[in-house]
Swiss-Prot record:
Any single biological process term in GO: glycolytic process
GO cellular component: cytosol; oxoglutarate dehydrogenase complex
UniProt similarity note: Belongs to the alpha-ketoglutarate dehydrogenase family.
An example molecular function term from Gene Ontology annotations: oxoglutarate dehydrogenase (succinyl-transferring) activity
InterPro entries assigned: 2-oxogl_dehyd_N (IPR032106), 2oxoglutarate_DH_E1 (IPR011603), DH_E1 (IPR001017), KGD_C_sf (IPR042179), ODO-1/KGD_C (IPR031717), THDP-binding (IPR029061), Transketolase-like_Pyr-bd (IPR005475)
Protein name: 2-oxoglutarate dehydrogenase E1 component
Record's function text: E1 component of the 2-oxoglutarate dehydrogenase (OGDH) complex which catalyzes the decarboxylation of 2-oxoglutarate, the first step in the conversion of 2-oxoglutarate to succinyl-CoA and CO(2).
Cofactor: thiamine diphosphate
Gene3D superfamilies recorded: 3.40.50.12470, 3.40.50.970, Multifunctional 2-oxoglutarate metabolism enzyme, C-terminal domain, TPP helical domain
Enzyme category, top tier: oxidoreductase
EC number: 1.2.4.2
Highest taxon above the source species: Bacteria
Keywords assigned: Glycolysis, Oxidoreductase, Thiamine pyrophosphate
Length: 928
């Protein structure tokens, strides 16, 4: 509100949003606005009034303004208009005046700085006792003295809460928020005592751990105590609004208090973690994780209501858990048929530096309103302790607030002083109601401080001496509130001390019980009952040929009145003809048959990824688009009335958040088949944190299993270093302890069985698939229906396909993926070379490989052939396994490597060079 504002006057400046909106409303229907406004707008000559379409601002010459105001408005109406503009200015800008910093380090602006004094709006001190009468759909109804109005708005907007709502496009939602904020909230004496008790327990538990286990890392929430109370209050409010389940995601700070105070983990269980150092029973033989990464779930009851609470496990990688929580919530909503997204909700707790520093925050926020990822809004708490480890706020962001990312989705933001617990709870109440009423994200930023260093063993005085000199002499939030209650007569001087003594006694009892407490493993319950951590037997995944024919034919049916692209008509006719003639099928058909068979038996399927509806390589076409009206038709959802649901969506251009969301979705129900597909496998490393910290390790760290399928197009076809490699070697490096399947299938039958195995198996492991590109249309990359038929199963190793005399074999080549077909075609009729394929690389089937190699015990040369450079692909992982298999087969020999030389880049950029390299490695492998 600078010079431009003063030039354009108090009414029609850039801040007069309500006038602009009212004017547009008047143009649409004059009778829809107040009579005074009708006269005012009618008094403006049309040829002198412009509505700038690009900015949606009213442009009215000054002389017209003055003439219209003088002719059409009484002094009372004019003062009301001025007061309206003042109200709007407060709403937009007064957050800069709010008392948000409990440490008082910030130099606050004044009303004069922001031009929020009454003189700016054409009012003066002589009018303070005049009555203001406002009835307006935008600013509400006000009938009071001007002085009372100013006092009211000073209290609301320049106190302990500062708000940013102007980014909200929904006028109804924005007005609702302002009205809620401007409404008084009162707490009864009993409410106040309960709040004080909550603060005592939050601080008391932290101090108890600090005393009993000095120096142990716990990432105390002290200084931000209000955040724990706010979370707990949000849950109680949600229960009253009909929410039946909440999933919480957060980082390490304050987690131990969240586990106990909010989620309901027994204090003795957390204390036992400190005493024993073990978080899971030893007999499970898992790595476990540090105590401040662990999740927990329980039920909370309030009066006659019950809610299920889950705190998601997470790593130290800040904000990584955000999309996982969202995906899990969406899955639970889908299980309940909660299409209104009102029964299950998410709460995410962020740190200030992480919220504005981690890209996954922006990715997750951007995807949240999209149909495939919408969960009806998330309640966000940002715990702003004004530091990022040792970095000051100025080092971690350029913006005033840490919450700017939230404006990507026009989320309302409430900033609140963490020392004012009642203000924190008022903001929380508004946020909870807003999320439930409007189904949108909302952010509550609690500005607080961190009592200790980043952890309890860290010395913050090295880098923040000024700040910590203030903190060490500061009253805690609990003490501040207790003093307020004593002053107001709610409690006496002894009440606070008694609360602390009683809670300390409770913790002493919990400590004694913790000494003999046996850790429990809470997993494989609910929908996961019947799932095993290990496979008990090979799973038959084939189905009858009749079923394959019936499903395949149904998939090829297109409604007569649906104007599909003519090329797709031919494609579907060709698929149908192939099935009818019992001819070998391609990859896309096999995938669709796997999906269809699972849907028919009641398994819901969810597939997302960039371009997944059609498929990057135009092979899937599971969503048909009407060429005339743009409507869609999904054959997989039109198999029968009794079938399960097939959900396919083209994701936003994100790997990290989208993969995280699908991983989270897979955690909720093991009976769902959940898939994420990369556009090219090369881009999967944009989600490396999800692979490293969750998919590969969540079972051993947190006892969390997942059956997620990851499809990564991978093959060296001359498309350059960014469209060739899914970095297969990285997945093999992550593979251990039977934590996942890593596969590089070459046949349609293999993908058919792999997909079905994910559901029919009695265990759940992530499935990593190096999926094909050119093989999607390769003449040899086909499978007979018999290979998908009854009593068939996935074959992790495929022997030489031609009939050979093993006594004549002079060379055995093992390989995986597309290079097999290159070798097969170049070999031709050479009957002295056998080629064996590994369809599954991990777990390595040593006994099966050894049994095949034993047939070739007279062979002198064993080769591993791959397209990838030697330092990439499979070689480094598999060489020891292959040689062990040779030993088990009784063959005294070792495998030799044939492939590209070591390289810093996965592939060359030149097609010509690629072709030369490919021919060289093929000829070397075949010895021609």
């Amino acid at each position: 509100m600078g010079e431009d504002f003063k030039k354009t006057g108090y009414l029609f400046g850039g801040n007069a949003v309500f006038v602009e909106e009212l004017y547009k409303q008047y143009l649409a229907n004059p009778a829809s606005v107040d009579q005074t406004w009708q006269e005012f707008f009618a008094g403006i000559k049309d040829n002198n009034t412009l509505l700038n379409k690009s900015t949606a601002k009213i442009i009215i010459p000054d002389e017209i303004k003055k003439e219209s105001l003088n002719n059409n408005l009484s002094s009372e109406d004019l003062n009301s208009l001025k007061a309206k503009e003042m109200i709007n200015a407060y709403r937009k800008h007064a957050h800069y005046l709010a008392n948000l910093d409990p440490l008082g380090l910030e130099l606050r602006k004044t009303k004069n700085d922001l031009k929020l004094n009454i003189e700016t709006f054409g009012l003066d001190s002589g009018q303070l006792e005049e009555n203001i009468n406002i009835t307006d759909e935008f600013v509400g109804t006000w009938n009071c003295k001007l002085s009372e109005l100013v006092t009211k708005f000073d209290k609301v907007y320049t106190g302990s809460i500062g708000v940013e709502f102007e980014q909200i496009e929904n006028v109804a939602g924005k007005n609702w928020l302002y009205n809620k904020l401007e409404s008084e909230v009162t707490f009864s004496s009993e409410d106040k005592k309960t709040i004080l008790n909550d603060l005592v327990e939050v601080e008391g538990f932290e101090q108890y751990l600090h005393t009993k286990f000095p120096g142990a890392k716990r990432f105390s929430i002290e200084g931000g105590d209000a955040s724990i109370v706010a979370m707990s209050k949000a849950i109680d409010l949600s229960m009253h609004q009909g929410v039946s389940e909440i999933v919480i995601g957060m980082a390490h700070r304050g987690r131990l208090n969240t586990l106990t105070k909010v989620v309901g983990k027994p204090y003795k269980a957390v204390i036992a973690d400190f005493i024993s150092g073990s978080v899971f029973p030893d007999e499970l033989n898992v790595s476990g994780d540090v105590k401040y990464h662990l999740g927990y779930s329980s039920d909370r009851t309030l009066e006659d209501k019950k809610i299920h609470l889950s705190l998601a496990d997470n790593p130290s990688h800040l904000e990584a858990v955000n999309p996982i929580v969202a995906g899990k919530v969406r899955a639970k909503q889908d299980i309940l048929g909660d299409t209104k997204r009102s029964k299950v909700k998410a709460i995410l707790v962020h740190g200030d530096a992480a919220f504005c520093g981690q890209g996954v925050v922006a990715e997750s926020l951007s995807m949240s309103p999209l149909a495939a990822y919408d969960i009806g809004g998330i309640l966000h708490f940002v715990i702003n302790n004004q530091l990022g480890f040792t970095a000051n706020a100025a080092d971690t962001r350029a913006s005033r607030y840490s919450t700017e990312f939230a404006k990507i989705i026009a989320a309302p933001i409430l900033h609140v002083n963490g020392d004012d617990i009642e203000a924190v709870l008022k903001a929380t109440n508004i946020a909870v109601e807003y999320r439930q009423k409007f189904g949108k994200d909302v952010v509550v930023e609690i500005i607080c401080y961190r009592k200790y260093g980043h952890n309890e063993g860290d010395e913050p005085m090295y880098t923040q001496g000024k700040m910590y000199n203030i903190i060490k002499n500061k009253l805690t939030p609990g003490n501040i509130y207790a003093n307020e209650l004593v002053k107001s007569g709610v409690i006496d001087n002894n009440y606070f001390a008694k609360l602390k003594e009683e809670f300390k006694a409770k913790l002493d009892k919990e400590y004694e019980q913790a000494k003999s407490y046996k850790q429990e493993a809470h997993f494989l319950g609910g929908l996961w009952q019947g799932i095993s951590r290990t496979r008990t037997q090979a799973t038959i995944t084939g189905i009858s040929k009749k079923t394959l024919h019936d499903l395949g034919t149904k998939l090829c049916e297109i409604p007569k009145d649906f104007a599909v692209n003519p090329k797709l008509v031919k494609l579907f006719e060709a698929r149908k003809a192939t099935l009818t003639a019992d001819q070998p099928i391609d990859w896309a058909t096999a995938e669709q048959l796997a999906f269809a068979s699972l849907l028919a038996s009641g398994t819901n399927i969810r597939l997302t990824g960039q371009d997944s509806g059609r498929g990057t390589f135009s092979h899937r076409h599971s969503v048909l688009h009407n060429q005339i009206d743009g409507t869609t038709y999904i054959p997989l959802n039109n198999l029968s009335k009794e079938q399960a649901k097939y959900e396919v969506a083209d994701s936003n251009l994100s790997e990290y958040a989208v993969l995280g969301f699908e991983y989270g979705y897979s955690l909720a129900n093991p009976k769902n088949l959940v898939l994420w597909e990369a556009q090219f496998g090369d881009f999967a490393n944009g989600a490396q944190i999800i692979f490293d910290q969750f998919i590969s390790s969540s079972e051993t760290k947190w006892l969390r299993m997942s059956g997620l399928v990851v499809l990564l197009p991978h093959a060296f076809e001359g498309q350059g270093p960014e469209h060739s490699s899914a970095r297969l070697e990285r997945f093999l490096q992550l593979a251990a302890e039977n934590n996942m399947y890593v596969t590089y299938p070459t046949t349609p039958a293999s993908i058919f069985h792999l997909l079905r195995r994910q559901i029919l198996d009695d265990t759940r492991k992530p499935l990593i698939v190096m999926s094909p590109k050119s093989l999607l249309r390769h003449k040899y990359a086909v499978s007979k229906l018999d290979e998908l038929g009854e009593n068939t199963t996935f074959l992790p190793v495929l022997d030489e396909v031609t009939k050979v005399d093993t006594n004549n074999i002079t060379k055995v080549i093992l390989c995986s993926g597309k290079v097999y077909y290159d070798l097969f075609e170049m070999r031709g009729n050479n009957s002295n070379i056998a080629i064996i394929r590994l369809e599954q690389l991990y777990p390595f089937e040593k006994k099966l490989v050894a049994s095949l190699l034993k047939k070739y015990n007279r062979t002198q040369e064993f080769i591993w052939c791959q397209e990838e450079p030697k330092n990439m692909g499979t070689w480094c992982y598999i060489v020891s396994h292959l040689n062990d298999a040779l030993k088990e087969a009784g063959i005294k020999n070792e495998f030799k490597y044939v492939g590209r030389e070591e390289s810093a880049s996965p592939a060359v950029g030149s097609l010509q060079v690629h072709n030369k390299q490919q021919e060289k490695l093929l000829r070397t492998a075949l010895g021609i």
